[in-house]
Swiss-Prot record:
Keywords: Mitochondrion. The lineage of its organism: Eukaryota, Fungi, Dikarya, Ascomycota, Taphrinomycotina. It is found in: Mitochondrion. It comes from Schizosaccharomyces pombe (strain 972 / ATCC 24843). Signal peptide: none annotated. Induction: Differentially expressed during meiosis. Disulfide bonds: none annotated. This is Uncharacterized protein tam6, mitochondrial.
């Protein structure tokens, strides 16, 4: 049997609509996130420039280019969010 002094009540849930809990990212967090997405986009772009000797290479190249541009745009969005 547990002693009554060790009994703990669960805390009340936090009201996320409360203005005290508005979440903002700090500048270093935004810079790291933007750098990571932009770097990933640049890497994907550089990999899309490598010639492919496979069937449907144009489709694969455009798919990788689309991902690269998406990552770069996400990085820019993350920076100015």
């Amino acid at each position: 049997m547990m002693p009554s002094s060790s009994f703990q009540q669960t805390p009340k849930p936090v009201d996320l609509d409360d203005p005290r809990f508005e979440q903002y990212d700090c500048l270093p967090c935004r810079l790291v996130g933007a750098g990571a997405f932009t770097g990933l986009g640049i890497y994907a772009y550089s990999q899309s420039r490598i010639p492919l000797n496979t069937p449907n290479y144009k489709l694969k190249r455009f798919g990788i280019l689309g991902m690269a541009y998406g990552f770069i745009l996400t990085g820019v969005y993350r920076l100015f969010q």
